[in-house]
Amino acid sequence: MKLRGRKVVGGKAEGELIVSKKPLSFLGGVDPETGIVTDAESDIRGQSIAGKILAFPRGKGSTVGSYVIYALKKNGKAPKAIIVGEAETIVATGAIIAGIPMVQGIDVSKLKTGQRVRINADEGEVEVLDG
């Protein structure tokens, strides 16, 4: 299955998906030292986003969340790429400063944790490789 969205940050990545059906706050919601989701309201609480393709509907919370994304990258705990339904300023800025490929305009309800995907953010494409 191929899904088409729009580029926020260019680049390519392939890997395992971790999908949240809820908006995600990076400040106080993701530990920048470990990449573990700590937000008590998150449906992926306790799971690591490190080295995975992270998909969620949109970001929420403080603008400091952008710097949490940057810290995740500097600590080697960032996702390989980000897929969102709606790219709001916090997550988009974080992906830009961290150099993480990002695509917006994707219906994340069509994606499942554990699937393998290939992202060509330059073209706004997300391809599900299995399941």
UniProtKB/Swiss-Prot annotation:
Name of the molecule in the record: Phosphomevalonate dehydratase small subunit
SUPFAM superfamilies per record: LeuD/IlvD-like
Reaction(s) this enzyme catalyzes, per UniProt: (R)-5-phosphomevalonate = (2E)-3-methyl-5-phosphooxypent-2-enoate + H2O
GO molecular function: hydro-lyase activity
Family: Belongs to the AcnX type II small subunit family.
UniProt subunit comment: Heterodimer composed of a large subunit (PMDh-L) and a small subunit (PMDh-S).
Active site per the UniProt annotation: S62 (proton acceptor)
Highest taxon in the source lineage: Archaea
Pathway(s) the chain acts in: Isoprenoid biosynthesis; isopentenyl diphosphate biosynthesis via mevalonate pathway
Keywords: Isoprene biosynthesis, Lyase
EC numbers for this chain: 4.2.1.182
InterPro entries for the chain: PMDh-S-like (IPR012016), PMDh-S-like_dom (IPR002840), PMDh_S (IPR020794)
Disulfide bond positions: none
PANTHER family named in the record: DUF521 DOMAIN PROTEIN (AFU_ORTHOLOGUE AFUA_6G00490) (PTHR36577:SF3)
Function: Component of a hydro-lyase that catalyzes the dehydration of mevalonate 5-phosphate (MVA5P) to form trans-anhydromevalonate 5-phosphate (tAHMP). Involved in the archaeal mevalonate (MVA) pathway, which provides fundamental precursors for isoprenoid biosynthesis, such as isopentenyl diphosphate (IPP) and dimethylallyl diphosphate (DMAPP).
One GO process term, biological-process aspect: isopentenyl diphosphate biosynthetic process, mevalonate pathway
